């Protein structure tokens, strides 16, 4: 299917066997790169990509750089000057020319490149809009009636998919008349067909239930749907349209891109709600930064931000190249999804004994970092996704979120892939794994005290900034303390001596003397004995008890023995605790070896008490409920006096709310501290209630309607 150009007919090729073997070698390198670009561009446009978007972008950039360095090696038409592959002769669809070429966009990949483009392309007003990851379409309306729907094709000629396009509810058969924008005699409308993220998940779930193959991503599903021979199959997919441009037109000349979008909306066509006019290069860069942090606020997948000169006269003056307008550019974000190969599946054991399967993969750059492992969540989920050893798989990593495996690329299988069988034994200690409850999807290791895997994660948690904040006790050092036999559990942590540390590799020199890291550990352990009581409570690793609940318990009871002696009913009334946390505290202290930890730390000098700063009141009973904020989506931004990011999140979630990182129409409250920034601006634009820190405290204690910011 891939278009091939005959390099043997070119001048460079005809001379390759004679005068200049070096030039012939360069020409062969160019031809190989050009063929790869054409092949991958073609399979992408027809919904069957073999590499990720980022890998294709890198391949195209490599070809462009090669041509810039060796122009003499270019032996024929280059894909760097082409929009897309021509429709194949074997296509079941009729090939039709566009009224006006349907060009692509040039890309930039960092703010330095974007700033350079902005310097070359100054404008009073720019338009920024999301780059939708879908399938391009060109709609031709004559006297307001839909006449043709074409794919982009090679930019000059596309495939006639009119019958399929008519099944989309977003594509009107007739444009609505408008007093402000009369319907022109002829107009080409360019847009993107896509599937919303929410609809894609529902569609794939239904396909799985029906035993059908699931789609790898919304873009492939949308592109494939538009090229179905049977329009009824197209109609079964939840396709949507966003219009983002106008091609040929007669009787209509908009003054700006923004005015063109107003006309499209007036005619009954969908336009993006995420488009924004900005008036400087600085504002463009601010939009780029904003959407880098808010990619998931949109209801569709997006892989970049498109920047356009708004003024139509300026667009005409700037003109186009053979493949793209000079007045527009696409800023491409680092990919959040990537394709790689699965080498192995292993089990990791967490702090609470949970066994989490994770994939070991070929290294892949995704969302700004190179990843080699990705979670499969639990054995049931791993089986559901159907991954096999040796599979090519799709992975996703959004920002700082742990990478996850989306599923296998089934079309890439060659029969050499192998089923993976999960061991029923803990990989760390050999204890049989079992669900904590009959309906629990997670497997757990019941050897809580002595399992090296659980102890390792508990030690690093104890040493973390949210607990004792112990320097020189990182993951490698914790591993060494455990596997050298120095610490069979956390009981002896505060009794460690120089002699103990000399039995480890992490804390000794080659001669066996205590090294600087060992000295630092002993110093910080001594200092940690005097930390605030709430940090000690956090370090006990009680389920559901983070900094917020720990502070509430410390302030209310004043000592670890009093916390241990409290009954669930009374503890449930403590502001910031509630019944779920109270039951978890009771269950933790009911385990005999947990009390041994408390006793050993106390004997070693860890402070186990403080002054009581809050007394229970009769009115407190039932005031804090686990569902106080149920159903509410809350965003915290800026700097707060009484909360860091994790404790604010815990305070919301312990009351049944959802703590999210970005503002959208679904956000119920924004809590704004100092230096709140763009999230505050967006919340105000959307009319979302904004709370200061005092209002946040009221919301946490009294629920919605009581902690709202007062109106002027």
From Swiss-Prot:
Residues 1-22 have a biased composition (Low complexity). Zn(2+) binds at residues 426, 429, 445, 451. NAD(+) binds at residues 53-57, 104-105, 129, 152, 192, 308, 332. GO terms for cellular component: cytosol. Keywords: DNA damage, DNA repair, DNA replication, Ligase, Magnesium, Manganese, Metal-binding, NAD, Zinc. Its cofactor is Mg(2+); Mn(2+). GO terms for biological process: DNA repair; DNA replication. CDD domains: BRCT_DNA_ligase_like, LIGANc. GO terms for molecular function: DNA ligase (NAD+) activity; metal ion binding. The active site is at residue 131. It catalyses: NAD(+) + (deoxyribonucleotide)n-3'-hydroxyl + 5'-phospho-(deoxyribonucleotide)m = (deoxyribonucleotide)n+m + AMP + beta-nicotinamide D-nucleotide. It holds the Pfam family DNA_ligase_ZBD. Residues 1-23, 69-93 are annotated as: Disordered. InterPro entries: BRCT_dom, BRCT_dom_sf, DisA/LigA_HHH, DNA_ligase, DNA_ligase_AS, DNAligase_adenylation, DNAligase_N, NA-bd_OB-fold. Residues 624-712 form the BRCT domain. Belongs to the NAD-dependent DNA ligase family. LigA subfamily. This is DNA ligase. It comes from Corynebacterium urealyticum (strain ATCC 43042 / DSM 7109). The gene is ligA.
């Amino acid at each position: 299917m891939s278009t091939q150009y005959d390099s043997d007919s070119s001048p460079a090729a005809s001379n390759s066997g004679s005068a200049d073997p070096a030039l012939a070698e360069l020409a062969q390198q160019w031809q190989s790169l050009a063929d790869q670009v054409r092949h991958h561009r073609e399979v992408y446009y027809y919904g069957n990509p073999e590499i990720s978007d980022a890998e294709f972008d890198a391949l195209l950039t490599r070809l462009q750089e090669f041509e810039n360095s060796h122009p003499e090696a270019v032996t024929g038409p280059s894909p760097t000057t082409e929009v897309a592959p021509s429709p194949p002769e074997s296509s079941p669809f009729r090939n039709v020319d566009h009224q006006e070429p349907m060009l692509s966009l040039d890309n930039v990949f960092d703010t330095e490149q974007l700033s350079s483009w902005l310097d070359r392309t100054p404008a009073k007003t720019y338009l920024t809009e999301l780059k939708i990851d879908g399938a391009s379409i060109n709609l031709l309306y004559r006297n307001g009636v839909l006449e043709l729907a074409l794919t982009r094709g090679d930019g000059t000629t596309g495939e006639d998919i009119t019958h399929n396009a008519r099944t989309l509810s977003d594509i009107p058969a007739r444009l609505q008349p408008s007093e402000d924008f009369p319907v022109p005699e002829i107009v080409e409308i360019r847009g993107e067909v896509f599937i919303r993220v929410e609809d894609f998940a529902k569609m794939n779930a239904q396909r799985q239930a029906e035993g059908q193959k699931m789609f790898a991503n919304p873009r492939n599903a949308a592109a494939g749907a538009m090229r179905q021979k049977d329009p009824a199959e197209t109609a079964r997919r939840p396709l949507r349209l966003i219009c983002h441009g106008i091609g040929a037109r007669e009787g209509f000349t908009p003054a700006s891109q923004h005015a063109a979008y107003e006309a499209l909306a007036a005619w009954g066509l969908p336009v993006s709600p995420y488009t924004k006019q900005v008036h400087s290069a600085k504002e463009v860069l601010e939009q780029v930064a904003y959407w880098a942090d808010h990619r998931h606020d949109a209801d569709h997948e997006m892989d970049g931000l498109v920047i356009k000169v708004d003024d139509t006269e300026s667009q005409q003056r700037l003109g186009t190249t053979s493949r793209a307008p000079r007045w527009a550019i696409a800023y491409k974000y680092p990919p959040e999804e990537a394709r790689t190969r699965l080498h192995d599946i292993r089990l990791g054991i967490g702090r609470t004994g949970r066994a989490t399967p994770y994939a070991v993969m070929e290294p892949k750059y995704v969302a700004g970092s190179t990843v080699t492992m990705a979670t499969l969540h639990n054995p049931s989920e791993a089986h559901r996704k159907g991954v096999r050893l040796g599979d090519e798989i799709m992975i996703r990593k959004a920002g700082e979120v742990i990478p996850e495996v989306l599923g296998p690329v089934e079309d890439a299988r060659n029969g050499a892939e192998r089923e993976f069988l999960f061991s029923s034994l803990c990989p760390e200690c050999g204890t049989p794994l079992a669900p904590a409850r009959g309906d629990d999807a997670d497997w757990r290791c019941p050897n809580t005290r002595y399992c090296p895997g659980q102890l390792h994660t508990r030690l690093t948690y104890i040493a973390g900034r949210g607990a004792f904040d112990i320097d020189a006790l990182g993951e490698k050092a914790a591993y060494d303390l455990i596997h050298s036999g120095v610490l069979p559990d956390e009981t002896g942590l505060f009794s460690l001596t120089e002699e103990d540390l000399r039995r480890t590799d992490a804390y000794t020199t080659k001669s066996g003397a205590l090294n600087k890291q060992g000295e630092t550990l002993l110093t910080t352990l001594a200092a940690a004995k005097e930390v605030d009581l709430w940090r000690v409570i956090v370090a006990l690793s009680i389920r559901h008890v983070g900094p917020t609940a720990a502070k509430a318990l410390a302030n209310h009871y004043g000592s670890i023995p009093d916390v241990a002696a409290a009954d669930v009913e009374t503890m449930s009334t403590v502001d910031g605790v509630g019944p779920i946390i109270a039951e978890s505290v009771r269950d933790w202290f009911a385990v005999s070896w947990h009390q041994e930890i408390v006793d050993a730390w106390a004997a070693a000098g860890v402070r186990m008490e403080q002054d009581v700063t809050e007394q229970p009141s009769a009115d407190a009973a039932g005031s804090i409920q686990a569902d106080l904020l149920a159903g509410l989506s809350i965003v915290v931004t800026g700097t707060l006096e009484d909360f860091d990011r994790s404790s604010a999140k815990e305070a919301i979630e312990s009351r049944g709310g959802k703590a999210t990182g970005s503002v959208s129409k679904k956000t119920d409250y924004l809590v704004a501290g100092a230096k709140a920034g763009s999230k505050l601006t967006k919340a105000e634009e959307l009319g979302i209630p904004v709370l200061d820190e005092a209002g946040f405290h009221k919301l946490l204690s009294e629920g919605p309607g009581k902690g709202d910011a007062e109106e002027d």
